């Protein structure tokens, strides 16, 4: 096999490795204060139960705030003190999906929310 073919094969393999891990979040929601909300984050391309999944918030014009993390393998969950009791983080390992949930939204919850591995 020529060096060009080996390089092309190596690049194809590396692109596959880089592209396979994905976290796909549910879409934007419009809700009123007092309503409940559950947003999802579906993982693929890796062992979902072997990595922590974190949630962060970005309020308009502000930086990122760490909310909490979950280890889907055993559902071990840790919250930032600022968010403890305000939200619930959970995971369903059978469908490789993590969740961030509010039982009663406030106007101050208006923000962008992101999951990360």
From Swiss-Prot:
- What SUPFAM superfamilies does the record point to? Immunoglobulin
Provide a GO CC annotation, any one: extracellular region
Q: Residue span of the signal peptide, if any?
A: 1-19
**Protein's cellular compartments:** Secreted; Cell membrane
- Protein's recorded name: Immunoglobulin heavy variable 5-51
Q: Which UniProt keywords apply?
A: Adaptive immunity, Cell membrane, Disulfide bond, Immunity, Immunoglobulin, Immunoglobulin domain, Membrane, Secreted, Signal
User: What are the start and end residues of every segment in region (Framework-2)?
Assistant: 53-69
Q: Where is this region: Complementarity-determining-2?
A: 70-77
Q: Where is the Ig-like domain?
A: 20-117
- A single GO molecular function term of this UniProt record: antigen binding
- Region annotation (Complementarity-determining-3) ranges: 116-117
Q: Where is this region: Framework-3?
A: 78-115
Q: How does it assemble?
A: Immunoglobulins are composed of two identical heavy chains and two identical light chains; disulfide-linked.
- For region Complementarity-determining-1, the annotated ranges are 45-52
Listed disulfide bonds for this chain? 41-115
Annotated region Framework-1: where?
20-44
One of its GO biological process terms is:
immunoglobulin mediated immune response
Report the function annotation for this chain.
Answer: V region of the variable domain of immunoglobulin heavy chains that participates in the antigen recognition. Immunoglobulins, also known as antibodies, are membrane-bound or secreted glycoproteins produced by B lymphocytes. In the recognition phase of humoral immunity, the membrane-bound immunoglobulins serve as receptors which, upon binding of a specific antigen, trigger the clonal expansion and differentiation of B lymphocytes into immunoglobulins-secreting plasma cells.
């Amino acid at each position: 096999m020529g060096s060009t073919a080996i390089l092309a094969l190596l690049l194809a393999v590396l692109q596959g490795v880089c592209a396979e891990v994905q976290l796909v979040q549910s879409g934007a929601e419009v809700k009123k204060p007092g309503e409940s909300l559950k947003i999802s984050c579906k993982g693929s391309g890796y062992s979902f139960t072997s990595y922590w999944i974190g949630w962060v918030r970005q309020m308009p014009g502000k930086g990122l705030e760490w909310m909490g993390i979950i280890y889907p393998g055993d559902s071990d969950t840790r919250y930032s003190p600022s968010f403890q009791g305000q939200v619930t983080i959970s995971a369903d390992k059978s469908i490789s999906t993590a969740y961030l949930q509010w039982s009663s939204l406030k106007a101050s919850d208006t923000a962008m929310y992101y999951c990360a591995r």
